[in-house]
């Protein structure tokens, strides 16, 4: 089930970052020791009641020219409209209602996306409620007073946000077609890839309008099986500032990855793996999605007998945090190896849904422990009682031990490698959870 996406929009200095940090807390999706994973706080995982969602901070995009504040607000609003299920529109009670608020409210209203209007910096409800009522003039619903800095009113605001989430459980029950996100930095050939796939022999294509983010998903039937391709291309922005475009492409990638079963990360063979490529791949890795790395423009590379090997090693070195990812060298222009994409998608989906019987799993772990003893600390040795798989997408395993503080990440990686040696889990992240139990339990 994909997570709903919530975007925060607001003028500079109204408290977007304060609200973002207040909601994210320590759950912000930054893996400190994982190379290539974005650290610039664009998105975070948030939980409220029984709901989990992804929050996107649309701030930090600077306009090239024109009215700075209004232009920036329009940029943010467009990103939110493009990517979000629900939009939090944050205003400032102390600055009051200003013209740019009204203009952006018009944009949001025309989008027909759910908008939760928030009035920030209401440190005293008794003192400021009369000023809060002024924001009814925006005509986009009830204003919700909060103080992000003091954590006041956030519960009521979140109650309103989750009311607007789509019923994704119904969607998942009704639609079991594999969903494939094509992601990558601008100009690597994402749209060309989808267009070429759509023209392949044995393919039937149809567009699906009116999805939750007003994108056009493409249904492609290949050899009698239908796949939904999610395209993050088509940046509807005139701004050419490099940092802005990169930030925007990451935001679009987050949205697409949330909805996908398999993520195809497209990189440019003529450029190699860039920092931006690594950030986007990191999003898919964090979300536990199946990953295929499509090295596009392979026809533009001069080759000898070692070219594929050398490029593969270089990619593995830079993207060392996803050693399980499948790599495919393609040309969207010529169609080279595109027929392999559907085959790989099927393999990755099958592996991402694989279950391993507890008995078989523990035979592997017992053998692995015999080959390499668990670590010790101050004379105390880690004991592994048993391992069981608890879920799929991604395959998730719980390791029961005597003291989880003794379970070093390197030993978890060792066990993961032994499990992969037996079952492969091609293109699939594996998640491990360590829990303590007493020996006689």
Swiss-Prot record:
Binding site for GTP 2: 184-191, 231-235, 296-299
Binding site for GTP 1: 10-17, 57-61, 120-123
Pfam families: KH_dom-like (PF14714), MMR_HSR1 (PF01926)
SUPFAM superfamilies attached to this UniProt entry: P-loop containing nucleoside triphosphate hydrolases
Gene3D superfamilies per UniProt: 3.30.300.20, P-loop containing nucleotide triphosphate hydrolases
Superkingdom of source: Bacteria
MF GO annotations: ATP hydrolysis activity; GTP binding; ribosome binding
NCBIfam families: GTPase_EngA (TIGR03594), small_GTP (TIGR00231)
PANTHER family to which the protein is assigned, alphabetical: GTPASE DER
Protein name (Swiss-Prot/TrEMBL): GTPase Der
């Amino acid at each position: 089930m994909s997570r709903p996406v919530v975007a925060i929009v607001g003028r500079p200095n109204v408290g977007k970052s304060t609200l973002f940090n207040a909601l994210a807390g320590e759950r912000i999706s930054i893996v400190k020791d994982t190379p290539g994973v974005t650290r610039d706080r664009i998105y975070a995982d948030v939980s409220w009641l029984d709901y989990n969602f992804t929050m996107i901070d649309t701030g930090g995009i600077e306009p090239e020219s024109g009215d700075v504040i209004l232009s920036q607000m329009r940029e943010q609003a467009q990103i939110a409209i493009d990517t979000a299920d629900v939009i939090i529109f944050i205003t400032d009670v102390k600055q009051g209602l200003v013209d740019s608020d009204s203009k952006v409210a018009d944009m949001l209203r025309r989008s027909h996306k759910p908008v939760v209007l928030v009035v920030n910096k209401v440190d005293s409800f008794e003192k400021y409620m009369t000023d809060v009522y002024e924001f009814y003039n925006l005509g986009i619903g009830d204003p919700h007073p909060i103080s992000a800095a003091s954590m006041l009113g956030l519960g009521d605001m979140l109650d309103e946000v989750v009311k607007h989430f789509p019923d994704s459980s119904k969607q998942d029950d009704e639609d079991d077609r594999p969903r494939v996100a094509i992601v990558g930095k601008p100009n690597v050939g994402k749209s060309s890839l989808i267009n070429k796939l759509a023209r392949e022999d044995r393919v039937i294509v149809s567009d699906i309008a009116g999805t939750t983010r007003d994108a056009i998903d493409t249904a492609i039937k290949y050899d009698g099986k239908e796949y939904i391709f999610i395209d993050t291309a088509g940046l509807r922005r005139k701004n050419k500032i490099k940092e802005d475009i990169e930030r925007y492409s990451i935001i679009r990638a987050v949205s697409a990855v949330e909805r996908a079963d398999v993520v195809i990360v497209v990189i440019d063979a003529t450029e190699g793996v860039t920092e931006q490529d690594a950030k986007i791949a990191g999003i898919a890795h964090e979300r536990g999605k199946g990953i295929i790395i499509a090295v596009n423009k392979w026809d533009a590379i001069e080759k000898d007998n070692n070219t594929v090997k050398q490029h593969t090693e270089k990619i593995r070195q830079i993207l060392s945090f996803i050693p399980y990812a499948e790599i495919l060298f393609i040309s969207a222009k010529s169609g080279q190896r595109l027929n392999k994409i559907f085959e790989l998608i099927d393999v990755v989906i099958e592996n991402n849904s694989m279950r391993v019987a507890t008995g078989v799993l523990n035979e592997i772990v017992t053998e692995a422990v015999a080959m390499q003893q668990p670590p010790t600390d101050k004379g105390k040795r880690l004991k592994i009682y048993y391992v069981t798989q608890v879920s799929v997408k991604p395959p998730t395993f719980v390791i029961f031990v005597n003291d989880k503080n003794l379970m070093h990440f390197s030993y978890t990686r060792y066990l993961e490698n032994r499990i992969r040696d037996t079952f492969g889990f091609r293109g699939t992240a594996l998640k491990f959870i360590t829990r303590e139990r007493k020996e006689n339990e």
